[in-house]
From Swiss-Prot:
Family, similarity comment: Belongs to the peptidase M24B family.
Cofactor details (free text): Binds 2 manganese ions per subunit.
Annotated function: Catalyzes the removal of a penultimate prolyl residue from the N-termini of peptides.
Protein name: Probable Xaa-Pro aminopeptidase P
Cofactor entry: Mn(2+)
E.C. number: 3.4.11.9
PROSITE patterns: PROLINE_PEPTIDASE
Lineage: Eukaryota, Fungi, Dikarya, Ascomycota, Pezizomycotina
Gene it is expressed from: ampp
Organism of this sequence: Aspergillus clavatus (strain ATCC 1007 / CBS 513.65 / DSM 816 / NCTC 3887 / NRRL 1 / QM 1276 / 107)
Length: 658
């Protein structure tokens, strides 16, 4: 899955005009069946909402108002009650920033969502395509709208402290200013229609899956805080809190987290959470080691801690540590930039390096998940080809979930299944809806990006199949993507290498054809946590230069190719170390440093009729055949009493030759 996902409407199909050829050396036209499709996404009339928001902006003396995507914990994934940017703009993708002035409104998003946003935004909105030449960033557009000493407002809990300071400085140079508006203005527009905050119970995540007790994790964190000579750590990221305390929740769809804050000092551990979410089991689990405090008291307590620190030791007192992703509001409550040390979270770094129990769990859950995918694709092919069943994209996704749910330790999906036929696959974060989605066409490419939560790990896998006869052009595109995926999987690199440096390996074969994809190549994956997990990843984001790949990291490997209105191709395998990023033996050790590589754990066959063997090198062909042999070895026992699926698996894992 590609760096964030959020439910969105639609997938109505309508006719389109002529196809546009891909710039391959030997182009072919796409099949007529593929050319029939197009996405017709709903738009929301935002005129009334914008009018009400502008009225509130006048009342609060704000000329420009910023509406981020994130919640007060800077979550990539949010609960329905925090979907403010979607409500005000109508755009339902997971990433983007809305900016509203008294006369204009703009939505900035990245390349994953250009297609979707262009269809969902109504005529009130200007789409700012992030990263496109001569298109302003949302900060630049905001600064332009604020010229002449105007005031820009934002909810200070929804923007990071570094982001707020950077924007404030840019505005100051332009004669304008940034203010924090404590009452969220979009919430006022939303009114009683805004969904209620979740109130789900929290549950204990057993140590046998976590690999460490929460007491051990807090001890390790305190050692880190002592080394940094800080007064304590104020934690706001939800997955970090869940990981630290070995707890899981259900407050955000597909992500087993819960709304909470925490403060860890050398002698205390405070968890800020609504007490109604605690069960007797959770209370017993935390015992006397953790003090429970009301969720809403975090800001008052942070201010009190900051004041007490200054009174005890004055300005020379040790500062509190705060993640550089924490909110502006939380930073201000601790006294602001001069009184806190903002840094990459030490919990994020620790969480990204899985221990032996977590790595074992990731291996095991991916084998079970692979068995589910094998059963699903065998069933799907039989329904579409042999039985001629009419299945829509949602029917198929529901069947996959039902198959997964039969497996041990299943705890739900890790994101909305992207079940997409034909050109719907070109919408990178496509989400079908019953009643408006497409009927799966066996003569078109079918892309399925899906994942599950298991108590022993989190999965994320994409497979692209064609149940008919793919065109030469489709096979070439698929094989170029496959070559890039193999290049990452087979990479050997010195310790200290970043995901930024590895990214070119996945793109090189597409680049030679003048092609590319507008998303990252890989992201970190949590252990029964968020399917997107920092700080590691493989891609062109600058932050991927900050943290090198290390043994114990679990990372996805998912290059792709998409042609709007035609098809999408993506192949994804989860990588990790020691299993997944692991130390490898090399003939030489230049610089006397360790060398690393990857071990794949995803166990699902690659669509063999989409592979063009003549485009693969001998080593790449061997990789495919070895991988398929490994899948057979690790999964065929699941189908001892299912001869149909076993036969399908045997066919799909047979060696390929040129």
């Amino acid at each position: 899955m590609l760096f964030s996902r959020s439910p969105f409407r639609l997938c109505r199909i309508s006719a389109v005009g002529q196809t546009r050829q891909l710039p391959f050396s030997r182009p072919r036209f796409l099949s007529a069946s593929v050319a029939r499709y197009a996405i017709d996404m709903e738009t929301v009339n935002t005129s009334e909402r914008l009018a009400r928001l502008r009225q509130l902006m006048q009342e609060h003396k704000v000329d420009v108002y910023i509406v981020p995507s994130e919640d007060s914990h800077q979550s990539e994934y949010i609960a329905p009650c925090d979907g403010r940017r979607e409500f005000i703009s109508g755009f339902s993708g997971s990433a983007g920033t809305a900016i509203v002035s008294m006369t204009k409104a703009a939505l900035s998003t990245d390349g994953r969502y250009f297609n979707q946003a262009s269809k969902q935004l109504d005529s009130n909105w200007l789409l700012l395509k992030r990263g496109v030449e001569n298109v302003p960033t949302w900060q630049e557009w905001t600064t332009e709208q604020a010229e002449g000493g105007k005031v820009v407002g934002v909810d200070p809990s929804l923007i990071t402290a570094p982001g707020a300071r950077s924007l404030a400085e840019t505005l100051r140079k332009n004669g304008s200013s940034l203010v924090g508006v404590q009452q969220n203005l979009v919430d006022l527009v939303w009114g009683e229609d805004r969904p209620a905050p979740p109130r789900e119970k929290v549950r204990v995540h057993p140590d046998k899956f976590a690999g460490k007790s929460f007491q051990e994790k807090i001890t390790d964190l305190r050692k880190e805080l002592e080394n940094k000579k800080t007064a304590g750590f104020v934690i706001s990221m939800l997955d970090e809190i869940a990981w630290l305390f070995n707890l899981r929740g259900s407050d955000i769809p597909y992500n087993p987290v819960f709304f909470a804050y925490a403060i860890i000092t050398p002698t205390t551990a405070d968890l800020y959470i609504d007490e109604e979410k605690l069960t007797p089991e959770v209370t017993s689990h935390l015992g006397q080691d953790v003090v429970i405090k009301p969720y809403d008291s975090i800001f008052a307590d942070a201010t009190a801690l900051s004041e007490a620190r200054k009174q005890d030791a004055g300005e020379a007192a040790a500062k509190f540590l705060l993640s550089n992703k924490a909110s502006w509001a939380l930073s201000l409550s601790l006294g602001g930039e001069e009184h806190v040390e903002e840094t990459r979270s030490p919990i994020a770094d620790a969480k990204a390096v899985k221990n032996e129990a977590e790595l074992a769990g990731m291996r095991a859950c991916h084998i079970r998940d692979g068995a589910a995918l094998i059963e699903y694709f065998a069933w799907l092919e039989n329904e579409l080809v042999s039985k001629k069943t009419s299945l829509d994209e949602v029917d198929a996704a529901d069947k996959l979930e039902q198959i997964r749910s039969k497996h041990d330790l299943f705890a739900g999906l890790s994101f909305d299944t992207i079940s997409s036929t034909g050109p719907n696959g070109a919408v990178i974060h496509y989400k079908p809806e019953k009643g408006s989605c497409a009927i799966i066409d066996p003569e078109a490419i079918y892309l399925c990006d899906s994942g599950a939560q298991y108590l022993d790990g989190t999965t994320d896998v994409t497979r692209t199949f064609h149940f008919g006869q793919p065109t030469e052009l489709e096979k070439k595109a698929f094989t170029l993507v496959l070559k890039g995926m193999i290049a990452i999987d087979s990479a050997v690199f010195p310790k200290g290498t970043s995901g930024f440096a590895l990214d070119v390996l996945a793109r090189q074969f597409l680049w030679k054809e003048g092609l590319d994809y507008l998303h990252g190549t890989g992201h970190g994956i949590g252990s029964y946590l968020n399917v997107h997990e920092g700080p590691i990843g493989i891609g062109t984001r600058v932050q991927y230069t900050e943290v090198p790949i290390a043994p114990g990291n679990v990372i996805s490997d998912e290059p792709g190719f998409y042609e709007d209105g035609k098809f999408g191709i993506r192949i994804e395998i989860c990588l990790a170390d020691v299993i997944m990023a692991r130390e490898v033996q090399t003939t030489h050790k230049f610089g006397d440093k360790p060398w690393l590589g990857f071990e794949h754990v995803t166990m699902a066959p690659i669509g063999r009729n989409l592979i063009e063997p003549s485009l693969l090198s001998e080593s790449e062909l061997k990789w495919v055949n070895d991988y398929h042999a490994e899948i057979w070895e690790k999964t065929h026992h699941f189908f001892e009493n299912d001869e149909f699926t076993r036969s399908w698996l045997q066919r799909e894992t047979q060696p390929i030759s040129k």
